[in-house]
């Protein structure tokens, strides 16, 4: 009976540990998405010499050759 108890405790610990790591990965992906969105927004005309595609900014049509 004690062996069954130890197996249940071990199984619970393993499941808890793996689900915690999975949620950490999701949080990392969310943070990366937010950082990338700030980079794209930052180079939409605010920095003329930025190394990004100017047409990624929807509200500045002159950067895409439409307003010239």
From Swiss-Prot:
Disulfide partners: 43-57, 44-52, 55-64
Signal peptide positions on this chain: 1-16
Modification type 4-hydroxyproline: residues: 48, 54, 61
Positions where Glutamine amide occurs in the chain: 66
Keywords of this entry: Acetylcholine receptor inhibiting toxin, Amidation, Disulfide bond, Hydroxylation, Ion channel impairing toxin, Neurotoxin, Postsynaptic neurotoxin, Secreted, Signal, Toxin
Propeptide: 17-41
A Gene Ontology molecular function term of the record: acetylcholine receptor inhibitor activity
Keyword Disulfide bond: yes
Cellular location(s): Secreted
InterPro entries linked to this entry: Conotoxin_a-typ, Toxin_14
Function: Alpha-conotoxins act on postsynaptic membranes, they bind to the nicotinic acetylcholine receptors (nAChR) and thus inhibit them. This toxin has higher affinity for the adult subtype (alpha-1-beta-1-gamma-delta (CHRNA1-CHRNB1-CHRNG-CHRND) subunits) (IC(50)=2.3 nM) of the receptor than for the fetal subtype (alpha-1-beta-1-epsilon-delta (CHRNA1-CHRNB1-CHRND-CHRNE) subunits) (IC(50)=22 nM).
Record's comment describing the protein's domains: The cysteine framework is IV (CC-C-C-C-C).
Family membership: Belongs to the conotoxin A superfamily.
Protein name, per record: Alpha-conotoxin PIVA
Protein's organism: Conus purpurascens (Purple cone)
